[in-house]
Amino acid sequence: MAREFSLKNTRNIGIMAHIDAGKTTTTERILYYTGRIHKIGETHEGASQMDWMEQEQERGITITSAATTAQWKGNRVNIIDTPGHVDFTVEVERSLRVLDGAVAVLDAQSGVEPQTETVWRQATTYGVPRIVFVNKMDKIGADFLYSVGTLRDRLQANAHAIQIPIGAEDEFKGIIDLVEKKTYMYGNDLGTDIEETEGFPAEFAEEAEELRASLIEAVADYEEEMMMKYLEGEEITIEELKAGIRKATLTVDFYPVLVGSAFKNKGVQLMLDAVLDYLPSPVDVKAITGINMDTDEEIVRESTDEAPFSALAFKVMTDPYVGKLTFFRVYSGTASAGSYVKNSTKGKRERLGRILQMHANSREEIPMVFAGDIAAAVGLKDTTTGDTLCAEKDNVVLESMTFPEPVISVAIEPKTKADQDKMGQALAKLAEEDPTFRTETNPETGQTIISGMGELHLDIIVDRMRREFKVEANVGAPQVAYRETIRQSAKIDSKFARQSGGRGQYGHVVVEFEPNEEGAGFEFNNKIVGGVVPREYIPAVEHGIEEALQNGILAGYPVVDVKAALVFGSYHDVDSNEMAFKIAASMAVKQLKDKSGAVILEPMMKVEIVIPDEYMGDIMGDVTSRRGRVEGMEARGNAQVVRSMIPLSEMFGYATGLRSRTQGRGTYSMHFDHYEEVPKSVAEEIIKKANG
């Protein structure tokens, strides 16, 4: 079977934004104009095509990135809709990993918002070129040039307008294209009556010419020939300017800014044109590299159909009709339905059962996938998020994804005996889909503990259990994922000796503990000289220390960022064994409590609160009362933005508190930033509570 669209005519893009910037509506309109939907679904009516899980339609937010294939002007555009809520950053990370380009959607009233910053940073990490769509120009307080300014000020982004709006708010009725020197006037809000004229309207001519000149100057920095022509005062053609903008955008250092209102059907088709004009095809991005697991050599996989097959699984979902669906991006080669591939990450042979091309939540079966395709497979039993799939005879692993540790936990128990078994299965399936969601059973209490990235994240997990798996559960109060660490070095001598008739137990170790760098984790060094502790017992010492650190030294929370060096010890020819050394090592950790300046660490959240002016004093006082610190303030339109750092333990139920303090006019967003030492008085409370 031949491929339908060449690689050059393929775009893999993500739509990324802050919550409520209108991302799902924008994606909807793209699907509508590319002929994929025959009726437009509105998010606020709960009928959106991309938001296909029940809770998404109820809450009006996008939770799972649905991958959709659309066509525009003879090109294939694969779109991944990503969530804008901070609790779902993992979904964003996953999708950015497999995209070639992205459209960042901004709200014309707010410009860059906190989650925009998070997503923008993630996109920069993965080297994803972007164009920016300033949406909601019809909204009260919409200000295009202010939004472009926030890109420069808050993200230090080299952003340049390639369009400007005619009018704003209710008066938003047209778009001026600075590149092609055209004007588009909209006769209605349905996108059916568009008048296109050459040139700039008289009252905007001066501003448009100025902005076009500064655009050319900015683009000339990336294109030498254009720079020469510009300096010599020669005319730069539309084709040259377009090619220059494309080249500049692909450097991931230049961002074209477009404008429109997806809800009012203005500017979406022009944005689709810009996706084709300025965002990369799989051929334009650097070839992916991987490691040959047999030889440890680096392998480059070019984006061609002739190269050996390689793909990355970026999402696993449970579908009520076909079972487990694995979304994957093909980087090189081809594969057909029914064929065998290798999961090189796990060393397992897998069969690609059926291959589906997804459209929001309907699907079309396809016989084959080619380089650059994004599709979903049925029948992959052992594949999870981040795994590499490759040709059977190959053994290449592509760079995987790293996911953040959960920061919040709750205890959960089934309401009835019948729910007990179902709950275990449901949680296992949900954990398989989402790497930032963990589930474990507390060995002492037998309680099931679920952990995730925020209250909303866990709410939605419990909700999905009820809807998809018909499991009713009671949920306990949220628990914070505290950590412990040491602040001083300590040398601990620990001996375990037991004689109880017959063969005894004997293990003796001397361990030097010292603080490690923040984020460096646990590090073990063997400094034994002359075999005072035989080599075969060393791994047992390491495991003993590591296991004991997991159980905490002050309040039972995992101890992080510690270096341990085994420096001395002794053994007994008959009585020593691995178990004895493991116990001696874990006893050494227990002695750290009084000798190492042990402290408790708590997750700190970066919180941005947007409130009307008159509540400013009240909210600032509230931040301080929650042990928070204000890190900055600014005016945004007629609202005030307070940026602060607040411990997670003080943020439970904050939404309700903020609502009542501001009569429902305040909003906030938060995401995990770092761990910080807990004040002594708070630490004493935590220890007291933990030790009952």
From Swiss-Prot:
Localization of this protein: Cytoplasm
GO biological process: ribosome disassembly
Primary residence: cytoplasm
SMART domains tied to this protein: EFG_C, EFG_IV
Family membership noted in the UniProt record: Belongs to the TRAFAC class translation factor GTPase superfamily. Classic translation factor GTPase family. EF-G/EF-2 subfamily.
Function: Catalyzes the GTP-dependent ribosomal translocation step during translation elongation. During this step, the ribosome changes from the pre-translocational (PRE) to the post-translocational (POST) state as the newly formed A-site-bound peptidyl-tRNA and P-site-bound deacylated tRNA move to the P and E sites, respectively. Catalyzes the coordinated movement of the two tRNA molecules, the mRNA and conformational changes in the ribosome.
Protein name in UniProt: Elongation factor G
